[in-house]
Amino acid sequence: MSADFINQPTFQYKNEYTTQSGNHNEVCVLIGHSIEAVTSAVVLASLGQRVHLYADNELLTQQIQQYGFEHHLQALWQMYEQQQVIISTALPASADTLIQYYETTNFSDSRHINESNEIDDQSTVALYWLFLDSIKPVWAEASWITAFNHSHQQSLPVIISGTEKLGVVSALAQNLQRAWVYYVPFVFLQEGDVYSSMLNPSLWLLGEKTANSRQHLEVLKPLMQHARAAHHADIATIEFARSSIMAMLATRVSFMNEMSRLADSQQVDIKQVSRIMGLDARVGSSYLQAGWGFGGNTLPTELAKLQQSSQTHSLDMPLLQSVMHINEDQKELIFRKFWQYFDGFIDNKTVMIWGGSYKSGSGRTAGSAIHPLLALLWSYNIRTLVYSDKAQDELAMLYQQQSLLQLINNPYQQLSAAQAIFIVSWSPQDQLDIAKLNQHAMPVFDAQNALTRLQIDSLVGDYMGIGRSK
């Protein structure tokens, strides 16, 4: 990827906002190794800011490698690191050490955290941004709060990000003595396109400890202005809104998956039903796709935290429990269709699996249906040929000792050796070659409902989807 290409989407931001952001000697201090922290560092650098990122170096390297499919982010990260616009440094053992370093009059004196970094003597901190998931294993909560409360720079804003039980972030903000404390939930982040989804967020939520104080976050002004929708409120309200949004999305997915089972019994195509439902403005079209369910880290983590919140207050949430139960059961549904198709005679077969990530465009397999599917297939000594271009490295690492797994580089490679095809995650941008499938006339078990009705009708072999069939 050329430097010219890399700079195209950020050029207007730099021209428009670099002069507004004021002091070029300011640095944004980010603390975390998560994909949210890395993306924030790159986006801030794209907006003309200098960034110091503190993280566990080993975990940071792993995170960047695991998100190798985020090509734009990777290229920008490398470029900004080479230019020292982003400087990543090992996270010190205590928050006090880090804060004291920035409160010295000369960053380059003997109290250097990392002596290899060449930092302008006149640098000042624009903000601190804490990513809770990353700091919790290293810094005890009481110690980092005390360190920030003992800081001599109480006018500096502190941003907190992370998914916690309801009220946790609000309590942290109250324990911090400074007025300018904010909460930014990453409800806008779209895996597979994390950079663009943060640069132009679909929804920007900002929790404020002190009402109507967002003017103190001048650095983030471009993101707020370019968001398709934005809202600010007290931190507790934003926490609750974040959790409610994610729970609603998960509920829609599980509802459609429950309806897909009824659609199977009625010989109705649930995909067509989803399109019709989307025409109703009261319903909308988002998250109405039936399939194997949802995975990743965001929705499952959010539901788990919400469940913990309800238990803390002794509240029963049967709807939430049903959503989680349906989702886990749905991941095994496509295997049951496979078992029924062959009347249980599935031992020692060979099958092809297309896709392994939890969503098309991602290279992450956390919560993906491929894991229970593989476990069930292997329990019958079934050989599995898996094509998953973006998730191949992660699958190879997870299952390196599994002799029944073979990772292949072409979806049509070894089709003649398989007795069935499973589709777990297939990108809409990748055209399916129905003619090649028809050369073998094997059954297709589509857990993603990836095929169009025209493609299904063109198949010589049988087709079983989720709430749809041939």
Predicted feature locations:
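NAD(P)+-binding Rossmann beta1-loop-alpha1 motif at the extreme N-terminus of oxidoreductases
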Residues: 3-71, 112, 351-386, 465
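Rossmann-like NAD(P)-binding element
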Residues: 81-155, 413-431
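Rossmann-like NAD(P)(H) cofactor-binding subdomain of soluble oxidoreductases
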Residues: 106-109, 124, 130-192, 451-456
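Interdomain hinge/lid region at the active-site interface
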Residues: 236-239, 250-344, 349
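Active-site rim loops that border cofactor/substrate pockets in soluble metabolic enzymes
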Residues: 359, 380, 384-409, 414
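Rossmann-like adenosine-cofactor binding region
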Residues: 399-470
